Amino acid sequence: MTSMETYQRADPLLGTALEGRYRVDAVIATGGMSTVYRGLDTRLDRPVALKVMDSRYSGDVQFLTRFQREAKAVARLKGDGLVAVYDQGGGAPGDEPPFLVMELVDGGTLRELLRERGPMPPHAVAAVLTPICKGLAVAHAAGLVHRDVKPENVLISDDGEVKIADFGLVRAVAEAGITSTSVILGTAAYLSPEQVGSGDSDPRSDVYAVGILAYELLTGRTPFTGDTALSVAYQRMDNDVPPPSSAIAGVPAQFDALIRRATDRDPAGRFADAAELGDALAEVIDELGLPAFRVPAPKQSAQHRAATAFHSGVLQDGSTDRHPNVGTADVRPPDPRRDTRVFTPDELPLPLEPLPDETEYQPATGQFAGIDLEHFHWARQRSKRVLAGWVVIVLILAGLLAMGAWTLGNNLPNLV
């Protein structure tokens, strides 16, 4: 029996209905703070994502108060680049564990895309960062700070939408005074110096994290490494983030400058918030004449595998009846106190269902920064700076030259 099959069958929440309404169908991923499930709102017949917090948070009044407050605040946010929050519940002593009901994004995470394809060319990086900045800008305008911007919290839909999730959870956990090594390991690479030094954070802390994320998208790695999460975190206290062009050839100077300002060790030197960062990014896109781009969802994502497991009838009792005796959950979830992980294709007991054909993609040849261009979708619109046909030819030639410099000048396997 595979570990995936064993886990799906052993999880006591599978097949139950949280608060008698939200059916728990399949595990998507598990981490230090929570387990994420594919589920169904049986009242509205709507697929949802269920983030069930670790059982150690149940009964913690301080955590539950903050958890409920943050959930209500995030649920009021509306805008592109944000994963919608529909409901929250649980957490009372003897009750179900605390949980969030969120929009189910059919696709995968930015982390999974990076693992599949490696570092991205500038136009793809811009396409990822633009909706992230828009989503964060909406939150910052409402007085909210994410505090945990990282590839695992960026979702990419099969339709090419990029959205950020998990607002407010870090603050709720921190104020509850409950920490774990796995939580620290999951965030250390993206923490701002002030978060490491004093624990303080504001919109500029999110800006710093986006700068680190931009560096990683361009180079395939984060700027600071170390043997422990603590050593990784403290490196940013005394060291500036190096320009990405020093790690991989072909990065435009405009991206070096953007990341340098976003990751200034002094918060006063950074962009004030995500809106200001987004405006600066738009100027870079315009100056470089970067084409619009449809971000591809990862092919082998945990979300896709969870959907396959559910639709194939893989349940804790091994039956083909997907929801026998669905009732309220009165059991605690499995203890997920370990590093966040998702299941690999080999762990799935049944073959993956084929994904829809990407007929809208326009095949091309070659690679750019380790990414097969044949998988990319180039929008059929010209850049505002393209005023005549000969400019298009110049841009194509420049892109081919950059592709050659990026591919030949780097040992891409070492960057993943």
Give each language-model segment a name.
Residues 1, 308-416:
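C-terminal or otherwise distal, non-catalytic regulatory regions appended to signaling enzyme catalytic cores
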